[in-house]
């Protein structure tokens, strides 16, 4: 068993990662462990890149590395923490999840983003939301920062009468 595979298995045993994250982690691990700073030999770099690819293929083959599963779990986790679609989409794209996988995972999630936005703003600012203009702007800024769309934010004031 080569070093990248052992490292990838250890890292994936703790929590899920995307394929791009595992590739970066394995490359950083090899860079630190082999001391390639002084020996910038292309043959060594090529061999380690092949080892990393082999480790990723092995992990995918055994079901330990799955971007779709990672995206579903990430969406579930971040939505429970009060983040909206825009923020989750941006974070997952930074983690290397492609747009089709991301869109599929978002469509599969049965989250009502309007209700989530209302619960997030009530948790932050208290239950009866103020109708004052200054407070509405404050609520809107907060929800935009959390990644909610304007339509979801407006629905707080139009769809919920309480």
From Swiss-Prot:
Keywords: Cytoplasm. InterPro entries: RecX_HTH_2nd, RecX_HTH_3rd, Regulatory_RecX, WH-like_DNA-bd_sf. One of its GO terms (biological process) is regulation of DNA repair. It is found in: Cytoplasm. GO terms for cellular component: cytoplasm. It comes from the Bacteria. Its main location: cytoplasm. It holds the Pfam family RecX_HTH2. PANTHER family: REGULATORY PROTEIN RECX FAMILY PROTEIN. Belongs to the RecX family. Modulates RecA activity. This is Regulatory protein RecX. The gene is recX.
């Amino acid at each position: 068993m080569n070093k990248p595979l052992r490292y990838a298995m250890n890292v994936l045993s703790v929590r899920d990662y995307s394929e791009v994250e595992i590739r970066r982690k394995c490359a950083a691990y090899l860079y630190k462990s082999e001391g390639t700073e002084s020996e910038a030999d292309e043959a060594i770099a090529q061999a380690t890149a092949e080892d990393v690819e082999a480790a990723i293929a092995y992990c995918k083959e055994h079901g330990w590395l799955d971007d779709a599963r990672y995206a579903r779990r990430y969406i579930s986790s971040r939505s429970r923490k009060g983040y909206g679609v825009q923020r989750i989409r941006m974070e997952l794209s930074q983690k290397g999840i492609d747009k089709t996988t991301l869109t599929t995972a978002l469509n599969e999630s049965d989250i009502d983003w309007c209700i989530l936005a209302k619960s997030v703003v009530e948790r932050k600012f208290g239950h009866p939301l103020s109708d004052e203009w200054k407070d509405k702007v404050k609520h809107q800024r907060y929800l935009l920062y959390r990644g909610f769309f304007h339509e979801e934010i407006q629905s707080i004031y139009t769809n919920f009468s309480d």
